């Protein structure tokens, strides 16, 4: 069975690698030290410090595993390989809702780099899926769980 790939820009992959390094070289040793100290308190059956450290260790190891998988199966998307005005991962798109003056700016990223609070939307989101492959001037119907609406693509630029 083929493994799932994780489309992302080179910058996104580098950010994941940096996060992985932080977890392995800083967080993991800190937690091991906390576990060692908590063990020194004696009876582990009622040792909340030990339980908390073990829970954090499990969480961090899960994060490490997830990041390693995403990095291993990263599919680097070169936004320069698509037309300059075509929406793709690694591009910033400004859309205007048809019939209004409302404009929204989206940075299309791989799922691993999504951060809605900074305008970075996953290529797997309904908005991005509707926009990817379209060009400046195209009118697009976006169907999201919250609403269905039409937008016009005002501009498409490579994200820095």
From Swiss-Prot:
UniProt feature coiled coil, ranges: 1-71
Pfam family membership, one: GreA_GreB
SUPFAM superfamilies xref list: FKBP-like, GreA transcript cleavage protein, N-terminal domain
InterPro entries on file: GreA/GreB_C_sf, TF_GreA/GreB_CS, Tscrpt_elong_fac_GreA, Tscrpt_elong_fac_GreA/B, Tscrpt_elong_fac_GreA/B_C, Tscrpt_elong_fac_GreA/B_fam, Tscrpt_elong_fac_GreA/B_N, Tscrpt_elong_fac_GreA/B_N_sf
Gene Ontology process terms (BP): DNA-templated transcription elongation; regulation of DNA-templated transcription elongation
Organism: Streptococcus pyogenes serotype M1
Known role: Necessary for efficient RNA polymerase transcription elongation past template-encoded arresting sites. The arresting sites in DNA have the property of trapping a certain fraction of elongating RNA polymerases that pass through, resulting in locked ternary complexes. Cleavage of the nascent transcript by cleavage factors such as GreA or GreB allows the resumption of elongation from the new 3'terminus. GreA releases sequences of 2 to 3 nucleotides.
Family of this protein: Belongs to the GreA/GreB family.
Protein name: Transcription elongation factor GreA
Record-level Gene Ontology MF annotations: DNA binding; RNA polymerase binding
UniProt keyword terms in alphabetical order: Coiled coil, DNA-binding, Transcription, Transcription regulation
Keyword Transcription regulation: yes
Keyword match Nucleotide-binding: no
PROSITE patterns xref list: GREAB_1, GREAB_2
Disulphide bond pairs: none
